[in-house]
């Protein structure tokens, strides 16, 4: 396993539409392991392949839960070729952040519930319903696979401001 570099806004790769994964290979399994290690190191709760410059339709997520003793129980999930089959008309709002837009958070409104189809690392296809933070996170990560960032869901003024800030920081870092 290896920690990979997370690409940061304004990197144009973040706007790429990721390619479907045809079959689960040992390379895809290693990529998934690297993605988990990278996500936990960051730390974050979700990571799309494109965020580590791998334009493949793969997502890792871990929405850990606290048990009765207050200990966090990891819940690692892999989604290969995920797609939203349906979304509720009801909306919910959560404050979102992104490992590719560090230290910037904004409230985003999304469908409160979604039905998702995806393939696991064993090549099995699943369908499941997601709600709450799980629905928000899966939508956020699937957006990445389609070249969409969470800032695309906020006002143009706020979006332009954050893009300008990160573009300026990238130029300063390049000097």
Curated annotation (Swiss-Prot):
EC number from the UniProt entry: 3.5.1.88
Entry keywords, A to Z: Hydrolase, Iron, Metal-binding, Protein biosynthesis
Cofactor binding, per record: Binds 1 Fe(2+) ion.
Reaction(s) catalysed (UniProt annotation): N-terminal N-formyl-L-methionyl-[peptide] + H2O = N-terminal L-methionyl-[peptide] + formate
Entry-linked InterPro entries: Peptide_deformylase, Peptide_deformylase_sf
Swiss-Prot/TrEMBL cofactor(s): Fe(2+)
GO MF term (any one): metal ion binding
Residue positions binding Fe cation: 98, 140, 144
Active site: 141
Listed Gene3D superfamilies: Peptide deformylase
Keyword flag Repeat: no
CDD domains: Pep_deformylase
Family assignment from sequence similarity: Belongs to the polypeptide deformylase family.
Name of the protein in its database record: Peptide deformylase
Source organism: Nitrobacter hamburgensis (strain DSM 10229 / NCIMB 13809 / X14)
Gene: def
